[in-house]
């Protein structure tokens, strides 16, 4: 069995839009009930809660058949990847060393209570990274962190916010990224993005791209026509004058100083993992 959450936390959010737990019309409720019933008939017993099934349904615009196919594909991948074993046994001992060449970390929350995730692509040096770790372990760590997001971070954030939190606020820093470095990490980024999109759908709350190089906004304008309107509204492409935009969404005390905030965690924000998930009154007790 995989790790489970034994401590209660809010299962709905009064401010959530239609299609989220506690905010369904009659058609959506019927589709949710049908999806759960079909999966139970197929022998599935885990991850059949409303919040999980609704994420798959929203990702497929409440098309029952497509949502079922997506869920079943995800369950097959979880078994093949060994996700349940990963949750119990994975240890990323090289994390601090990896962080020097590829900083990626969760750090406190935004004004809506979402965990903030920071990724700094400009620091990536795959040659040095692969002297410390392997592509396989990097992917395992990615999946492990997604699981901890669901098992520990979201429940703690939900308790503190007083309502269900099921998305994160991402800051992707492109400072120092050039054409050469983008090409070298494209394979990893593509694989990581595929895992996120296919197996952890509807986890994006806000997405800020900062220090975007010249031409990035134009390139994004070309592809945003293929994205649904709700997704486009979540994405903000910013240049080097990003500080005010970030501070509108993230309290200064929660934003690392190197990104324009006031926070200077001892030992560095990128290794602190500071947030409600480590605060006694909000974290899982078991």
UniProtKB/Swiss-Prot annotation:
Keyword terms of this UniProt record: Membrane, Nucleus, Protein transport, Transport
TM region(s), chain numbering: none
Record's keyword annotation contains Nucleus: yes
Region Disordered: start-end pairs: 1-24
GO-annotated cellular components: cell division site; cell tip; nucleus; prospore membrane
GO process terms (BP): ascospore-type prospore membrane formation; ascospore-type prospore-specific spindle pole body remodeling; intermembrane phospholipid transfer; post-Golgi vesicle-mediated transport; protein transport
Residue stretches making up the CRAL-TRIO domain: 94-267
Places the protein is found: Nucleus; Prospore membrane
CDD domains hit by this protein: SEC14
Keyword Chloroplast: no
Annotated InterPro entries: CRAL-TRIO_dom (IPR001251), CRAL-TRIO_dom_sf (IPR036865), CRAL/TRIO_N_dom (IPR011074), CRAL/TRIO_N_dom_sf (IPR036273), PI/PC_transfer (IPR051026)
Recorded GO MF terms: phosphatidylcholine transfer activity; phosphatidylinositol transfer activity
Job of this protein: Required for transport of secretory proteins from the Golgi complex. Catalyzes the transfer of phosphatidylinositol and phosphatidylcholine between membranes in vitro. Essential for viability and secretion.
Official protein name in the record: Sec14 cytosolic factor
Gene name as annotated: sec14
